[in-house]
UniProtKB/Swiss-Prot annotation:
<dbReference type="GO" id="GO:0006412">
    <property type="term" value="P:translation"/>
</dbReference>
<keyword id="KW-0694">RNA-binding</keyword>
<protein>
    <recommendedName>
        <fullName>Small ribosomal subunit protein uS8</fullName>
    </recommendedName>
</protein>
<dbReference type="InterPro" id="IPR035987">
    <property type="entry name" value="Ribosomal_uS8_sf"/>
</dbReference>
<dbReference type="Pfam" id="PF00410">
    <property type="entry name" value="Ribosomal_S8"/>
</dbReference>
<keyword id="KW-0699">rRNA-binding</keyword>
<dbReference type="GO" id="GO:0019843">
    <property type="term" value="F:rRNA binding"/>
</dbReference>
<comment type="similarity">
    <text>Belongs to the universal ribosomal protein uS8 family.</text>
</comment>
<keyword id="KW-0689">Ribosomal protein</keyword>
<comment type="function">
    <text>One of the primary rRNA binding proteins, it binds directly to 16S rRNA central domain where it helps coordinate assembly of the platform of the 30S subunit.</text>
</comment>
<dbReference type="GO" id="GO:0005840">
    <property type="term" value="C:ribosome"/>
</dbReference>
<dbReference type="GO" id="GO:0003735">
    <property type="term" value="F:structural constituent of ribosome"/>
</dbReference>
<keyword id="KW-0687">Ribonucleoprotein</keyword>
<dbReference type="InterPro" id="IPR000630">
    <property type="entry name" value="Ribosomal_uS8"/>
</dbReference>
<comment type="subunit">
    <text>Part of the 30S ribosomal subunit. Contacts proteins S5 and S12.</text>
</comment>
<dbReference type="GO" id="GO:1990904">
    <property type="term" value="C:ribonucleoprotein complex"/>
</dbReference>
Length: 132
């Protein structure tokens, strides 16, 4: 059976692995998931990511980041725009996550950007997720 929302599946796997203190989490690979992983690494939520060959297709493996006493670097993840209800934001009305402490991942005409990057470029788009 096909997956309806692969981005929500990625975020759920990441949330579950983070709450269970796993060091890595694997999932089926796609380009958009790789771009989301790149943003999470740039913002310091994960230590790294890699694409591995699997028996069928490829797997994306994320290395989770924890503090010195195993504090989680990801406090929360929320999927915003869903297949049943798309959420868009104009460049003048981009969301702020926790007053700027978190990150909104936005799909724009310039690719996937954070809310801060989209504001600097002056573009809006589909608000995929919040991470804080």
């Amino acid at each position: 059976m096909t997956m309806t929302d692969p981005i929500a599946d990625m975020l759920t796997r990441l949330r579950n692995a983070n709450s269970a203190y796993h060091d890595t989490v694997g999932m089926p690979h796609s380009k958009i998931k790789s771009h989301i992983a790149e943003i999470l690494q740039q913002e310091g939520f994960i230590t790294g990511w890699k694409v591995e060959d699997a028996e069928v297709g490829k797997n994306l493996v994320l290395e989770l980041k924890f503090g010195p006493n195993r504090e989680r670097s990801i406090a929360g993840i929320k999927r915003i725009s869903k297949p049943g209800l798309r959420v868009y934001a104009k460049s003048t009305n981009l969301p702020k996550v926790l007053g700027g402490l978190g990150v909104a991942i936005i799909s724009t005409s310039h690719g996937l950007l954070t809310d801060k990057q989209a504001g600097k470029k002056g573009v809006g788009g589909e608000v995929l997720a919040y991470v804080w």
